[in-house]
Amino acid sequence: MKTIKRISVLVLVSLITNFTWAQTTTDNRSLYEAFEMSVSDGLNLQATAKVGIRPVYGLFSVGTQFVAENYKWAFGAGVGTHLIRNENHSMNLEYMIFHVNENEIWTDNYNNFQQIRLLYSKRIGEKLSIFGGPSLNLNIAENKQSYGHTFESTFDPYSFYSHVGNNHTAKGWIGFTLGIRFDKK
C-alpha cells in the first residue's frame, strides 16, 4: 500500500513539473497537446487530455463503465512517452492511475485502477489520428470493514490474476483500447 501511494505521488509530481516546464518553454514546437476519446474493456468510454513536451507528457482522464450492471466512473492522471513518432505514425507507452467510484458519486474506500497501455496511432487527417493497442490492467480495492460497511469492487470485467489479502483485493486482466485523437503533427 505504501509503495502504491509513493508511486501515485511520484506520478503527480512529475505531471505538475512537466506541465509547468512545458508552459514556460519558449520553443512551442516541443509542446505536445492532444485530446482523445477512447473505448476499452476497463473504462468503456474515456476522455483524456494530454500536455507536455515531445518525449514525455502528462495525462488527465475521466471515464465510465456504462455496460456494467452498476454505475461506475473514474478519474485519474498518468504519464506517457513517444516511443516512435513521425508524420503519419506514432507508438506511445502510457501509465495511468485512476480512483474508481462504484454505485455512488464518490466511493470513500480505496478503489484503484492502474493501466499500462502500448498504443499505435495512424494519422488520418491534419489534426486527427486513430489509435489502438493492448493494455495491462490492475484493480486494487480495499476489502476490509471501513466507513460502516465492507466494500468489494466489481470493476474488473474479467480477471486472469486475482489475489485476496487481509485488507485488499487485486484483480488483473489484459485488455484493448481503441480511440480517436485530436492533435497537431
Regions found by a protein language model. Give the residues of each.
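Solvent-exposed loop segments that connect transmembrane elements
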Residues: 146-160
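Short glycine/proline- and aromatic-enriched beta-strand/turn motifs that initiate or cap beta-hairpins
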Residues: 22-70, 181-185
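Outer-membrane beta-barrel "beta-signal"
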Residues: 79, 169-185
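N-terminal non-cleavable signal-anchor helices
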Residues: 10-17, 57, 68, 83-85
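Extracytoplasmic loops and strand-loop junctions of Gram-negative outer membrane beta-barrel proteins
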Residues: 31, 101-103, 157-164
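Cleavable N-terminal export/targeting peptides
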Residues: 1-28, 184-185
